[in-house]
Regions:
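Positively charged, low-complexity nucleic-acid-binding target-recognition regions
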Residues: 51-55, 63-171
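Substrate-contacting helices/loops that form the catalytic groove of nucleic-acid
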Residues: 1-63, 151-171
Length: 171
């Protein structure tokens, strides 16, 4: 049973990484940025059964395979720490650092301190709603490329979207 599960998992990883590299090639991207936190699976509490399944997902192995496949196509893969990327707003130009996190916003009496409206929905200072994962992804990019800026008049990121697109991978 474990062998079959592992084979399905690695088959999915190979298909997913191929789709990511193909998507990057179609967009003309030469760099893929991935957020990664050390020991991020240890503090998760989703329930006994879900935790058992979730802990077994080889995130590091997926990154290794993605780096290998991207390197074959001439694409660079960069991993970076994700800290404070989901607590700060890309649209408002906030740097993803401790001083702009929820705790420090609360100390400075900046409201709202937690701008997650619902699960998966983030609100910028001007009220613009953006998918929380998309906001976090743009902040991860800003951690690597700190000179990237966004304004409604000057977009340095081509194809900026506020809601993610869904990619279906047949297993």
């Amino acid at each position: 049973m474990t062998l079959k599960r592992n084979q399905k998992l690695f088959d999915f990883i190979h298909k997913a990484t191929k789709s990511i590299v193909d998507y990057a090639l179609n967009c003309g991207a030469n760099t893929i940025v991935i957020g990664k936190n050390k020991n991020w699976k240890r503090s998760i509490h989703l329930g006994k059964r879900i935790n058992q399944n979730f802990i077994g997902i080889p995130h590091s192995r997926m990154i290794e395979i993605l780096k290998y496949k991207a390197n074959l196509k001439g694409i660079t893969v960069i991993t970076t720490n994700e800290s404070y990327t989901s607590q700060t707003s890309f649209l408002d130009g906030e740097k993803p650092c401790r001083e702009n996190g929820n705790y420090h916003r609360k100390l400075k009496y900046l409201s709202p301190s937690n701008r997650r409206i619902y699960r998966g929905l983030f609100q910028s200072n001007d009220g613009t709603l953006v998918n929380a994962d998309v906001n976090g992804a743009y902040q991860i990019i800003r951690k690597v490329f700190s000179d990237v800026r966004f304004s409604k008049f000057n977009q340095e990121i081509r194809g900026l979207v506020l809601s993610p697109s869904k990619l279906t991978i047949n297993v």
